[in-house]
Regions:
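Structural detector for internal amphipathic alpha-helices that build alpha-solenoid repeat scaffolds
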Residues: 7-25, 43-57, 66-69, 74-93, ...
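Generic alpha-helix initiation/capping and coil-helix boundary signal
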Residues: 13, 41, 99, 114-115, ...
């Protein structure tokens, strides 16, 4: 049976399933799970994440955070779910997850399920001012970069390249619903004005939701209330 040395996956589904099942049957200690999270292959890291129920130290939190970006999507999604479960159920753990740059990068993951879990997890860390300020700063940088890239695109550019920036912009706007207080008002106004003029209606719809949520940009609100798209206008109904 051929095995990919980088991922730990076998080429046939049944073998991968059997390996995962055999791991689930084992009783791992916390230290063993921690080691698998650090050094395991893809199936091992997935199973270790699902079984990792205690986060008591910075080392525990770091082992999860280090697998939130820059690794296989199966691991990233499992870790994003686990972090959400931990932060939503334990206030004591919040101080261990102050990694604003990593959270910001994970906010724009290519997997929308991960984006949603990370945005919802970040809300629990908002009370930590250091995290909130630095996370928001990173999100604003990504937002501005996406807007700049979209300004450069022309009709001949490939659709997937444009969609990549729109996807980033969408999730940045979603995250700003929770952190808009940490953005300079003029800067936020400029961003919202640009987004309100975007040709993609989902961006205008997300902008309308943010404008309505913040409630202090009447000119942009009036513009979006008259938008050509039904779903954008419906935000204010």
């Amino acid at each position: 049976m051929d095995k990919d040395l980088n991922t730990g996956y076998y080429k046939d589904f049944d073998t991968n399933f059997e390996q995962a099942y055999s791991l689930l049957e084992k009783n791992f200690s916390h230290e063993e799970l921690l080691k698998l999270l650090k050094d395991g292959n893809i199936p091992e890291k997935q199973i270790a994440t699902f079984m990792f129920d205690e986060v008591n130290t910075e080392e525990d939190a770091e082992a999860l955070i280090n697998n939130l970006t820059g690794c296989d999507g199966k691991i990233r999604e499992a870790v994003a779910l686990k972090i959400y479960q931990i932060l939503s159920s334990s206030k004591e753990c919040l101080k261990l997850f102050i990694y604003p740059k990593i959270f910001a990068q994970a906010t724009i993951d290519i997997n929308a399920n991960i984006c949603r879990l990370v945005v919802d997890s970040a809300k629990f860390l908002k009370a930590n001012e250091e995290f909130a300020i630095n996370y928001t700063d990173e999100i604003i940088k990504i937002t501005k970069s996406a807007l700049d890239e979209l300004d450069k695109f022309i009709f001949r550019d490939k659709k997937y390249v444009i969609n990549k920036q729109l996807f980033k912009l969408y999730w940045c706007l979603e995250s700003l619903k929770n952190f808009y207080e940490f953005v300079d008002r003029e800067e936020l106004s400029t961003i919202l004005e640009k987004c309100a003029q975007n040709s993609e209606y989902t961006i205008r719809e997300k902008t309308a939701q943010l404008v309505r949520f913040v409630g202090s940009f009447p000119d942009i609100e009036e513009q979006l209330k008259k938008d050509e798209n039904y779903y954008v206008r419906c935000v204010f109904d």
